[in-house]
Amino acid sequence: MAAPEPARAAPPPPPPPPPPLGADRVVKAVPFPPTHRLTSEEVFDMDGIPRVDVLKNHLVKEGRVDEEIALRIINEGAAILRREKTMIEVEAPITVCGDIHGQFFDLMKLFEVGGSPANTRYLFLGDYVDRGYFSIECVLYLWVLKILYPSTLFLLRGNHECRHLTEYFTFKQECKIKYSERVYEACMEAFDSLPLAALLNQQFLCVHGGLSPEIHTLDDIRRLDRFKEPPAFGPMCDLLWSDPSEDFGNEKSQEHFSHNTVRGCSYFYNYPAVCEFLQNNNLLSIIRAHEAQDAGYRMYRKSQTTGFPSLITIFSAPNYLDVYNNKAAVLKYENNVMNIRQFNCSPHPYWLPNFMDVFTWSLPFVGEKVTEMLVNVLSICSDDELMTEGEDQFDVGSAAARKEIIRNKIRAIGKMARVFSVLREESESVLTLKGLTPTGMLPSGVLAGGRQTLQSATVEAIEAEKAIRGSSPPHRICSFEEAKGLDRINERMPPRKDAVQQDGFNSLNTAHTTENHGTGNHSAQ
């Protein structure tokens, strides 16, 4: 009797099908941004009150809201801002914050350091948008907080809250990519409603930029018409654009105001000008933003009459533009004691410059290969092949001319190949230069000149007194002063479309980009 055959093992199950193209995450710890846009029912409760935590959690994940919800938030916030005075009056205790510049994830850190808006009074000094890539998230979140806490959270206007700068820098493009031009226009209307200054505790004038030769009293500010695009000159422009002089407190000139050569508009004001304004208006100090600070803040020379710093600058965007390596700070004022709380930058999602997509980013590689092939195709032509069958009809000069034309074409394509090669090989340096030039474009001729030109690239300031040094390919910006020098051209008011030349230069003007949880406290009585 034959032995039974051994049982055969069941065949192994087929392997699971591969994930759809693009569905696999290279960095698996980083989740996809949610594709669902929050609806009205999710953002607002039955009474029309915003659910701020729902919105915050969604925005932190890079989520978006329905366009109609974005418009509702912006318009409701604007309606509250329109009812406020041009110079609002606020009381201590309060936390004063400087520039944010689209750094939404650092704004979340700011509220951790400064305290919950539910039980902390806040005053923001402007510049919520531009340069950073999460500006619309900053606007939506701050406007929702304004709707929730209209009497304890206050927003002033900065020089970037205008059509001119948001078109020139990144905010308009961001709105169109993430939402639409309708959302951008709604933001512009809301920005026109932002107050220009705040009087804190009847002791401090809080403003984005500083003083104006046309403003002598607080009533001069109260009388300004703020519901418009800021002009290129005048008191409204000065409140948003002016700066303390570079030798503030040690001036050699006795002129209170001088032309602001850094901004290309408005003025520098000096220590005597500030002291005179404080004395005439019975104030202790001026608190302003508008300038990046290595420590996140700066206290200037003390007033001789009060012994208090005559001027304080606060800046709340840490590691500005991802290159400044600066700390950020907020100012907490309570019981006549002023504390400065510093904080470092938080991790954030990465965007290519100017919201570039990966296909555009890959074009230099593709272009290099295509031009390389063209050069090779054209280069295999011998002198004999450059002649036609009817060569006897042409004289020697014509044949030489045809060969020279072909050679010129080969040289032109070779030059193009060189551009693409530099773009690909030096992409990191190109990124750095793009981020630190106002239009997001490299200086003309840099790429065609190859590596040597890239290493010595310069960006001319509008008045061209001095060119700003560029970055060499292997170099990384490693100090605050170096970043500030490279970014100096972006501090200027950009040229306006209706620019006219006056006195040899434009009368138009520009602006001013691993989480550490440590905070520092410094007190000034």
Swiss-Prot record:
GO MF: calcium ion binding; calcium-dependent protein serine/threonine phosphatase activity; calmodulin binding; calmodulin-dependent protein phosphatase activity; enzyme binding; protein dimerization activity; protein phosphatase 2B binding; protein serine/threonine phosphatase activity
Binding residue positions for Zn(2+): 127, 159, 208, 290
Renumbered residue ranges of the record's region Calcineurin B binding: 357-379
The keyword Nucleotide-binding appears for this protein: no
Autoinhibitory domain, as annotated region: 475-497
GO BP terms: calcineurin-mediated signaling; calcineurin-NFAT signaling cascade; calcium-ion regulated exocytosis; heart development; locomotion involved in locomotory behavior; lymphangiogenesis; muscle cell cellular homeostasis; negative regulation of signaling
InterPro entries reported for this sequence: Calcineurin-like_PHP_ApaH (IPR004843), Metallo-depent_PP-like (IPR029052), MPP_PP2B (IPR041751), PP2B (IPR043360), Ser/Thr-sp_prot-phosphatase (IPR006186)
Subcellular location: Cytoplasm
Tissue: Expressed in kidney (at protein level). Expressed in hippocampal presynaptic termini (at protein level).
UniProt modified residues of type Phosphoserine: 479
Subunit details: Forms a complex composed of a calmodulin-dependent catalytic subunit (also known as calcineurin A) and a regulatory Ca(2+)-binding subunit (also known as calcineurin B). There are three catalytic subunits, each encoded by a separate gene (PPP3CA, PPP3CB, and PPP3CC) and two regulatory subunits which are also encoded by separate genes (PPP3R1 and PPP3R2). In response to an increase in Ca(2+) intracellular levels, forms a complex composed of PPP3CB/calcineurin A, calcineurin B and calmodulin. Interacts (via calcineurin B binding domain) with regulatory subunit PPP3R1/calcineurin B.
Family label: Belongs to the PPP phosphatase family. PP-2B subfamily.
Domain notes: The poly-Pro domain may confer substrate specificity. The autoinhibitory domain prevents access to the catalytic site.
The protein's name in its UniProt record: Serine/threonine-protein phosphatase 2B catalytic subunit beta isoform
Source organism per UniProt: Rattus norvegicus
